């Protein structure tokens, strides 16, 4: 298996610190709002990578944090008249709802920065003691010049950065590029006791501390959105390696941006979408498949038209699954026949091709193409004459390959029944309101899909024809 390591800017053989085990840390959300589709792509991508590593037999310890103390959180809490803790509690709950709806597996642990205050203070103290940090008026700064390899992740040149940083310079700092790892309390802000007075941690130190305490001095994978590469991840490396003297993470993985209608997503352009807004209109499978239809290191363009195209493609896959589920009930031959054994073995080539694509830096776009090729083959060769064993095998294989991507796991029968019952309720409501046109439209639309409604004294019944 090969992964693209941002640290070296090349694909490398994936060799974990402990064979068969992966220690993985992903930067999670700052919990002051609902997460948007750009965040959603990051969460879906690294959920998929985690799932695939598990599919390949690795035991993955997956940590994704919540930043629950931060300038944005303080500002939002003040605006709405709540405490930072109340705000964090609320949006952590909302995060879980949206992540569950998006079929994102729960992390091994989701630590909150505020749970690690004692450990963060110890981390800062160690950096001061080792000469990598200094205190001024209750603020503590990390000295970037003391860390010789600063800039190695992002490829930034420290001298050039220093020139650029001389705008709005804090004269108290020894160097313009030094960054805060502990901030003294300002009026109205939450704060914790420390050797430097009341204050709170800087953002970068929070992740370094949580990764260190939950995964150890060196981890296998550190991941996040490409916008975090500098300064956040660069600063994490500096702090962590200055403290331990050891490599912080072997592999750095970064997912690319989502543009909206070929423009950068922003509230000012009125093209800002939360994941929740999209999930109200589209199933999780649609959004996941869309997010994975491009390589994770490549920017993707988001539009409702592209989502509709993804939905149409996914519907074709589910129609094939539905046909196979129906075949499973209808076929009469139970056991695999000799001539089917060869075909069953031939289908293994799709699994091998899928693994080949995913082993090449998690190429989900090509892996999805392999699933389409498999289904085209099955549509032609698995029929009413096939054995139950072969039909079941093909269904299981499709679901097996869909599982690491987090798609194609629903039973089409169960989802179809749920959808039809919902439409029947809407029709009943329309009839009660004497909206005959809408009631007839729902009935006719269902008929076009092969669903016939029967109005009986016991209620509405339906059947497929």
Curated annotation (Swiss-Prot):
Catalytic activity: tRNA(Cys) + L-cysteine + ATP = L-cysteinyl-tRNA(Cys) + AMP + diphosphate
SUPFAM superfamilies, alphabetized: Anticodon-binding domain of a subclass of class I aminoacyl-tRNA synthetases, Nucleotidylyl transferase
Sequence motif 'KMSKS' region, location on chain: 264-268
Origin: domain of life: Bacteria
UniProt binding sites for ATP: 267
Subcellular location: Cytoplasm
Residues binding Zn(2+), per UniProt: 27, 207, 232, 236
Protein family (similarity comment): Belongs to the class-I aminoacyl-tRNA synthetase family.
Name of the protein this chain belongs to: Cysteine--tRNA ligase
NCBIfam families tied to this protein: cysS (TIGR00435)
HAMAP family in the cross-refs: Cys_tRNA_synth (MF_00041)
InterPro entries in the cross-refs: Cys-tRNA-ligase, Cys-tRNA-synt_Ia_DALR, Cys-tRNA/MSH_ligase, CysS_C, Rossmann-like_a/b/a_fold, tRNA-synt_1_cat_dom, tRNAsynth_Ia_anticodon-bd
Family matches, as Pfam families: CysS_C (PF23493), DALR_2 (PF09190), tRNA-synt_1e (PF01406)
UniProt GO molecular function: ATP binding; cysteine-tRNA ligase activity; zinc ion binding
Subunit structure: Monomer.
CDD domains, A to Z: CysRS_core (cd00672)
EC number: 6.1.1.16
EC class of the enzyme, as a word: ligase
Organism annotation: Clostridium botulinum (strain Langeland / NCTC 10281 / Type F)
Cleavable signal peptide: none
Motif placement: 'HIGH' region: 29-39
